[in-house]
Amino acid sequence: MCYFHAISGSPSTLSRNSFLLQWLEQRLAPYDIGLRSTHAIELQPFKSGASDRLTDLINTVRDAQAILLITPVPSEDWAGCMKTLLQFLPAGALQYRPLLLIGTGGNIDELPNLERSLDRELTRLNGRLALSSIHIGPKNWVFSTSRSPWLTAGTELRLHRALNQLHSLALEPVTVS
């Protein structure tokens, strides 16, 4: 089965990013595309099994059709988590796979700063942002005491369109110049 790989730069596996990953997995299922994910927090050097998880990340990224980078914007103080995680990957690891960057938290004005902060690592990894980055801030979520948070209809539509485009790009042959 083909799959997309999502890398979450959130400082916690119990965050809105986790709900976003569940949503993405459900939306990719009709395409027969699985979603594998890695949380930056799982790769901290002092965590048991971190080196095995890093090896697994390298292998799954290598075989993924596309990569989703989901990380807090710079003001959330955790964007450094994603940058550090990307530094663990060997040069060229992304092999020109189409990437979608999803910035979470903060506000949309910070998205260009997030893109710039990751640019050097993405270049080293041969990554290419294939689509315009997407921002999902607190106002893009609906919260209720009776159920898990969910995305607003407009946010779902934007993400659904981006996944359609990413899926199409993943099927195209890569031309490297």
Predicted features by range, described:
Residues 1-91, 153-160, 164-167, 171-177:
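N-terminal beta1-alpha1-beta2 submodule of the flavodoxin-like/Rossmannoid cofactor-binding fold
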Residues 5, 98-100:
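Catalytic His-Asp charge-relay segment
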Residues 12-14, 109, 141:
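Short, acidic Gly/Pro/Ser/Thr-rich loop/turn segments
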Residues 35-46, 125-145:
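Mobile beta-alpha loop/short-helix "lid" or hinge segments that flank ligand
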Residues 90-95, 123:
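Short, conserved loop/helix-junction motifs that constitute active-site signature segments
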Residues 100-139, 154-157:
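Short, glycine-/small-residue-rich phosphate/pyrophosphate-handling segment
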Residues 148-150:
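An extracytoplasmic/periplasmic, membrane-proximal ligand-sensing/linker region
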